Amino acid sequence: RHVAYTMGKYGMSLCVLGMADEYRGKVAVNALWPKTVINTAAVQNQLGGVPAVQAARQPSIMADAAHAILSRPMASASGQFFIDEEILRETGTTDFGPYRVDPALEDNQLLPDFFLD
């Protein structure tokens, strides 16, 4: 159903695994996946317009999760596939309400990412 997205995720996955091995001990290479749909132009224009955007999270959740990963010591993880919400929970975040596009929705009403559903 989502060939281009699937190919992109698969390619990213192979790059993470390959580069993590190639650059072992020099740089950590990881992937970060969203737990839910993220409010992006692609979601607005291709996935479902306003209804999809309303059931999405803000891009800032990915930025905060990336910051959490990049703040770790390099030796702590490489070749890993992280999920934004899980990383933030590990750092103590418990309220994900501020990341919702529509604050009236509960987390269980948000659209899950294609590959995590």
What is the predicted function of each stretch?
Residues R1-K26, W33-V50:
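Catalytic loop of short-chain dehydrogenase/reductase
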Residues A31-L32, G49-D117:
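C-terminal helical subdomain
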